[in-house]
A protein has these predicted regions:
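Core alpha/beta structural scaffold of self-assembling particle/tube/pore-forming proteins
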Residues: 1-65, 77-433
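Short, glycine/acidic-enriched capping/hinge loops at junctions between secondary-structure elements
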Residues: 67-69
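Helix-start/capping segments and mature chain N-termini
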Residues: 73-75
Length: 433
């Protein structure tokens, strides 16, 4: 449906929308989207995801028909390279702004006041969209944000997160559902009480304890029990991903680099990665209990080197990076690092000496505490359809009539999927605390 046109008598016309589009040029969108999101900023974006799916091939083995004996090599000449084909579909994120027509008309002598109001609101929408995209590209595709463990009674509206630092994934006003499991194969989590949700009323987030107060008691969610672990999902996001789920979510770091490795018979975007667990699902390093941070990262780097791979970036939660810095004391070295491809921001990065050279330790709040990723950033990118995020101008305008009220709406959206060209050149690990 075409966007509404306002006559001069109404004091409002298409100039507002032209100005709105001008304000939100690509540079401003990137500046808002990438701020304090090093992984999102660093990922290469390729606007090429046309069609329903994208067939992404990863070559993981060279032809093995050679021999020191001529006759044997000739006999085995039909040996071919080994490749995995992942059939990817897009993940999505949507936001919209509603504008009341009467309020628009009431600003006819000062169109700039309306623009200023909507710019402020749009900035917050882009900020929130980008935060959700950032969470998704770190996640496992299930939509799970964090876990909590119930106490001896469900007659409470307050929960305490198992990992306090993950409290930043929640906001006052958001709606959460409760999952009884946390799948690792891309399937959607099982939601308690047919997906019934509660609203976040307040939160108190610290590095040591995070509590969230909900709009109702846990007892109001059918199927929950005392002293059990459950998982929190943003309403409408517990959809999983995979070839049988064309409207699923995003397979982020946790799914491309599973900490427990691929399972035999799995179907990760239609392929069983267990045929070569390292080259198709990355390397893994599990630190021994009490192992020092420095030792863990050096051992992990050596493990990655065994796979003929090397990383240039190590992503850690700020809590872990702080512990590592304190452990090193005066041995800490820093360098100036630009975590993004756009040059919008430089950040001081600690230097980690790896087996193949220096790696940049980057503080990333969306990495789970206790986990780290050693990444070859040249292997990671986002396959997109238009910008991530972008303004909806599908019908030639930035706005359209609302069907159930006297208003118009402006839509923002993102269509994208995270892609890795060589999982085997990357690693996931855990610290020993």
């Amino acid at each position: 449906m075409p966007a509404p046109a306002f006559s001069g008598a109404g004091g409002f016309d298409s100039a507002f929308f032209a100005a709105y589009k001008h304000v939100y040029n690509q540079h401003k969108i990137q500046r808002l989207a990438y701020r304090n999101r090093p992984l999102f900023a660093a990922l290469r974006k390729e606007d090429m995801f046309e069609g329903d799916t994208y067939n992404h091939s990863v070559m993981f083995e060279d032809p093995q028909g050679g021999s020191m004996t001529f006759a044997t090599a000739i006999a085995q000449k039909m040996s071919s390279s080994q490749g995995a084909r992942f059939i990817l579909s897009r993940g999505r994120e949507y936001q919209a702004i509603s504008m009341d027509v009467e309020a628009i008309a009431a600003t006819r002598s000062d169109k700039g006041s309306l623009l200023r109001k909507k710019v402020t609101e749009t900035d917050r929408i882009i900020e929130e969209m980008s935060r959700r995209i950032d969470i998704a590209i770190h996640g496992d595709g299930t939509g799970i944000l964090a876990s909590f463990t119930t106490g001896s009674s469900l007659a409470t509206t307050t929960i305490t997160l198992d990992q306090p630092a993950l409290g930043l994934r929640f906001s006052v006003g958001m709606y959460v559902q409760f999952a009884t499991n946390s799948p690792t194969d891309g399937t959607a989590p099982t939601l308690a009480d047919n997906g019934k949700f509660l609203q976040v009323i307040s939160r108190n987030v610290t590095a040591k304890v995070t509590t969230i107060t909900l709009s109702g008691q846990l007892a109001s969610i059918g199927g929950l029990a005392t002293t059990n672990k459950y998982f929190l999902v943003r309403n409408g996001c517990g959809i999983g991903f995979g070839t049988s789920n064309p409207y699923g979510g995003v397979s982020g770091l946790k799914s491309w680099l599973p900490i427990n490795g691929p399972t035999v018979g799995e179907s990760f975007w239609g392929f069983d990665r267990s045929v070569d667990a390292q080259r198709l699902a990355g390397s893994r390093y599990i630190a021994a209990p009490g192992e020092k941070f420095e030792v863990t990262l050096q051992n992990a780097s050596a493990e990655l080197e065994l796979q003929n791979a090397s990383a240039d970036v190590v992503l850690l939660n700020p809590v872990d990076l702080n512990k590592y810095s304190q452990e090193l004391g005066t041995k800490v070295r820093y360098m100036e690092s630009d975590p993004g491809t756009t040059g919008l921001k430089t950040a001081g990065a600690m230097i980690i000496r790896g087996q193949s050279g220096d790696m940049k330790a980057i503080s990333d709040p969306q990495v789970d505490p206790g986990t780290f990723y050693m990444l070859d950033m040249s292997t990671w990118w986002l396959a997109t359809l238009n910008g991530v995020p972008h303004l909806d101008t599908a019908d030639g305008s930035t706005a359209r009539r609302e069907s159930t009220s006297d208003g118009i709406e402006i839509r923002w959206r993102a269509w994208y999927q995270m892609v890795c060209d060589a999982p085997g050149r990357n690693m996931v690990g855990t610290f020993g605390y």
